[in-house]
From Swiss-Prot:
Annotated binding of carbamoyl phosphate, by residue: R64, T65, R114, H142, Q145, G270, P271
Keyword Cell wall biogenesis/degradation among record annotations: no
GO biological process: 'de novo' pyrimidine nucleobase biosynthetic process; 'de novo' UMP biosynthetic process; amino acid metabolic process
Catalytic activity: carbamoyl phosphate + L-aspartate = N-carbamoyl-L-aspartate + phosphate + H(+)
Species of provenance: Azorhizobium caulinodans (strain ATCC 43989 / DSM 5975 / JCM 20966 / LMG 6465 / NBRC 14845 / NCIMB 13405 / ORS 571)
Family, per entry: Belongs to the aspartate/ornithine carbamoyltransferase superfamily. ATCase family.
Protein name (Swiss-Prot/TrEMBL): Aspartate carbamoyltransferase catalytic subunit
Enzyme class per UniProt: transferase
Job description of the protein: Catalyzes the condensation of carbamoyl phosphate and aspartate to form carbamoyl aspartate and inorganic phosphate, the committed step in the de novo pyrimidine nucleotide biosynthesis pathway.
Any one Gene Ontology molecular-function term assigned to this protein's record: aspartate carbamoyltransferase activity
GO cellular component: cytosol
InterPro entries registered for this protein in UniProt: Asp/Orn_carbamoyltranf_P-bd, Asp/Orn_carbamoylTrfase, Asp/Orn_carbamoylTrfase_sf, Asp_carbamoyltransf, Asp_carbamoyltransf_Asp/Orn-bd
Subunit structure: Heterododecamer (2C3:3R2) of six catalytic PyrB chains organized as two trimers (C3), and six regulatory PyrI chains organized as three dimers (R2).
Record pathway: Pyrimidine metabolism; UMP biosynthesis via de novo pathway; (S)-dihydroorotate from bicarbonate: step 2/3
Amino acid sequence: MITAPFFTLDRRDLLGIEGLSAPEIVGLLDLAEEFVVLNRQIEKKRSTLRGRTQVNLFFEASTRTQSSFELAGKRLGADVMNMSVGNSSVKKGETLIDTAMTLNAMRPDILVVRHHASGAVALLARKVDCCVVNAGDGAHEHPTQALLDALTIRRNKGRIEGLTVAVCGDVLHSRVARSNILLLHTLGARVRVVAPSTLLPTGIENFGVEVHRSMESGLEGADIVMMLRLQRERMAGSFIPSVKEYFHYYGLDEAKLKRAKPDALVMHPGPMNRGVEIDSAVADGAQSLIREQVEMGVAVRMAVLDALARKLPNATGAERD
């Protein structure tokens, strides 16, 4: 069994990439590298969270993120409880604050929360006494997705600084895009966003990105092509003429990918809409990192839980205020 180096985040919660320093991000990525090694061994357990309780509270349905956090917690020795909101008091009219206070009375050590409203996780974090991890809030942030994407890029390219990363698709509704832009910018990458005007948030230029409205110009010379899911469930109006037309202009196929560098790599946070934002030949091709992203997700979430756990009372290596 490996012995990972101690790394402690100087905060109780991980609510977003915004506010994280470059050394904090790199520290989490370095720790996650150790967990990649651990997860490829027969014995995958560590005891950082032994005796601790982790509650996964998902107000939005998720398969991969919830499963990834559950596996991460269990591999660190935590008692993990998945709370089904569909069968909870929330469906009976209980407010988010009431839910937070009820959970807090049960004295969990870590809450992993996904919510459909931007800012809801930060609000909940102010009402509880335990560590809180944002597993995605509205169109705001998804910090662990950005961290796992960064780890995937760094392992395959050897660096992040100086790379050109094209983030393509439904930027408007994407918390993944926002967190990735913040992280990549912090670590020195050149970031482009590629989307039709209807799927670009107002003021996106203020994030220090290049804005392209065509895949042809946006992918030119890119090192990484990061596709985003078209989130039709969040679209109340007509953001695109049709799925067929969207794929024609903004779906990643082999012809469009040739605009990027010959050694460019393709990413997607999942779940994918094949034939909408990405062609199967590209998703399953030699340049795709999509399956590797899933593996990195468990390691990154273990790193986040491990780093936050060291701030818990009586934790090994814990800092006391």
